[in-house]
Amino acid sequence: MKKIVGILAAAAVLATSVFAADVSAKVKLDGKLLNVDTTKEKDGVSAVSIGHNTDESWNPVLNMAVSGDNYGASVGFYIGKWDYGEDPSKWQGWNHGYGVGLKEWKIWFKPIDVLKFDVGRIDQATNQESIDYDTRLFNYDEWGYRVGFSTNGFTLNVAFHQDHDEFWFSQAANGDAITKGLNVFASYGADFGTILAFVDFNDTFRDIKAAAGYNNQFGDIRLFVDAGIQLDGTKDQESVFGAGFDVGFKYAKDALYFEAYARWFENNFEVLGKEGDPMYLYFKAKFSYKLDPCTLFVYFKDENLMAKKFASTIKAGATGSVGSCNWECYAQIDTGKGANGDKINFAIPVSFSVAF
């Protein structure tokens, strides 16, 4: 590990004399001052823990990026490692639980100003909330190739995407042809706002997602809305039709911030209103107010407001910084716990991070 870091550091120093290089790192620790678990026969109480949240697959420990006028690349170290199957040359999946590994590899280049190619880890999404940056109507985040054309506010991206080290097209002898993800994304921005379209084909064109969206900034208010349909098909069965929409609202002025996001989706209209209907209404909101020593906030999230049991996450606390060190401390209540969904969990989580 030391040898790898040394090589990367030397490469970064050498790179600065040739093109723009950026090396960023982040040290983040998460813990709990108190945890009360009421899901057991007798309430369990524990206190004072610290560690690293390995579930934050989006949070790199170390990121290196280089760029020139018309090209660039980046690679990221994350907590976790690639798992291998019987064939040691094949990466089977990312394991969050142990070690440090290189997960994100990206290269881009522009033969001409309006044309851009991305290879490696690529992603695309409809409008996305900025409370947790993890919720949107449709998206993909995989490995592949993407070509993008941009001019005068118009953007068109076409991408072939699939799992790591997987072929987009394959056909065994005397077998059926199999294709993975094909995505087309277009957007146009002007004074009236930005309109977008998202179409994704997967599983040999049997799984289809299509959406249209709009977003705009009205002074201190940002609004967006998306509506889409999906067709979930298999080789031997009829396709299942679903549809949904999402709405985002954000207000930020001076010390005040409020954001809310809602997403409704029906995955299968054939069972609409029946037992086992997968329809859901996802909702989250956050309010914060900046003071001199810290920022106070209240947070609410429920993954399905239409569920029979009230299962939500409620947070109230503060965030702040001392120099480059950021801290967060809050009380958290999780409802809907236990086998019957009638228990709660109470905790006081803390986190500390320094980015450099």
Protein language model features and the residues they cover:
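Outer membrane beta-barrel
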Residues: 23-24, 53-166, 182-183, 187-190, ...
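Sequence/structural signature of outer-membrane beta-barrel proteins
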Residues: 32-41, 78-92, 122-134, 161-177, ...
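Residues that define the transmembrane beta-barrel architecture of outer-membrane proteins
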Residues: 48-60, 98-105, 139-145, 150-152, ...
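Transmembrane beta-strand segments of Gram-negative outer membrane beta-barrel proteins
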Residues: 20-42, 117
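Outer-membrane beta-barrel "beta-signal"
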Residues: 322, 343-356
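Cleavable N-terminal export/targeting peptides
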Residues: 1-24
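Detector for outer-membrane/organellar transmembrane beta-barrel domains
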Residues: 187-196, 200-308
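Outer-membrane beta-barrel strand-turn architecture
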Residues: 67-70, 111-113, 150-155, 188-192, ...
